[in-house]
Amino acid sequence: MANNYQTLYDSAIKRIPYDLISDQAYAILQNAKTHKVCDGVLYIIVANAFEKSIINGNFINIISKYLSEEFKKENIVNFEFIIDNEKLLINSNFLIKETNIKNRFNFSDELLRYNFNNLVISNFNQKAIKAIENLFSNNYDNSSMCNPLFLFGKVGVGKTHIVAAAGNRFANSNPNLKIYYYEGQDFFRKFCSASLKGTSYVEEFKKEIASADLLIFEDIQNIQSRDSTAELFFNIFNDIKLNGGKIILTSDRTPNELNGFHNRIISRLASGLQCKISQPDKNEAIKIINNWFEFKKKYQITDEAKEYIAEGFHTDIRQMIGNLKQICFWADNDTNKDLIITKDYVIECSVENEIPLNIVVKKQFKPEQIIEIVAKELNIKTDLIKSSIRKNNIVWARDIVCYILKNKLNLTLTDIGKLLNGREHTTISHSISKVQKILDDENSQEALQINLIINKF
């Protein structure tokens, strides 16, 4: 059926008279590929956001007319052009046009701009996206399992973008339902303001938020150790759950690490699904940079510059985006209108404007150097790591080496096996998984020891 859609699409494009659309638009249409039909909409993939804007800007009505004529027997009358990054969103039913905002409360203009169309989805955040999909599912078992949804991760990994996009998607899909957004400090300030006015104002504040069909509460850790504020939240939480509402929470730590809360509150927070949003790696950061510049077509930036920025800031998306804004500001005010942003340009502007970007590019290590350093840190001989000896301390060192070679040098399992005297794929994969599982428990002694070693590279 997919091939049939492409054939019908190609036929429709050939029928469009040349004088109705530009040569550029026609070339874009010729290279476009049909993706899938969902809810009566045929999604068509173009190369990038710039091409998408050209088609949607001036020619969409003409194109839709000819497509509708060709697809009328298929009962398809709506057509949407998307970019490759949006395919997963289509598959998850997450690509929703942002329209009505009347059912969103306490959403800033910035929050309203967040959506899944401009979010890079990769390994570091994919589980969170899937969890949100389950929370919003019509399947009661899937939805209740994820309610409340507790997303945790370090500062700057994109938690706000994800939950705001989720709120906007839910609002557009459910125009008659109410969505509330609160950040911990903001909730505390408004509670204090209501308290000063009297008990009735506190009750009204509570009643308003408790009426939410979806409550998004960020940085829950900011109300720990504030007993009256936490108690109010506890009551709101219970009311929303009793009324069949949904709750998404974020924090920089897991529920069990929120030591300032009473146990009954921690128990409620952990009663649904917990999902970690990891820090993106360098390659994922480059994807984010590419996506960011995709929507800012007037800038040209070299791959070397992207790698330089990603290397320095791939663990903190927020800081990285801040640096991109700073760099684009310099480019906007440069007298060279044909400017290409290079690595050297970024460094020169940083020095000239006395605004350090704090990009620290770490030394590149060779595989043998990594093996030597790990051996030294763990006080064993280098050749023992490559040996077949199965003593616990040697296996431990070997596991760490496998993890670092994979995650720092991006070596294949085959390459790692060759370095370690022909070890099999399954053995290498098991070592990497074992270390990752330890690292997921960030506060364990083993994780702390591994991180001390990893941070040397």
Curated annotation (Swiss-Prot):
Q: What is this protein called?
A: Chromosomal replication initiator protein DnaA
Query: Which residue ranges are recorded for the region named Domain II?
Result: 73-108
Q: Where is the signal peptide?
A: none
Source organism of the structure: Ureaplasma parvum serovar 3 (strain ATCC 700970)
Segments of this protein annotated with the region Domain IV, binds dsDNA? 332-457
> Could you give the domain comment from the record?
Domain I is involved in oligomerization and binding regulators, domain II is flexibile and of varying length in different bacteria, domain III forms the AAA+ region, while domain IV binds dsDNA.
Mind giving the lineage of the organism this protein is from? Bacteria, Bacillati, Mycoplasmatota, Mycoplasmoidales, Mycoplasmoidaceae
Q: Which UniProt keywords apply?
A: ATP-binding, Cytoplasm, DNA replication, DNA-binding, Lipid-binding, Nucleotide-binding
Family statement drawn from the similarity comment of this UniProt entry: Belongs to the DnaA family.
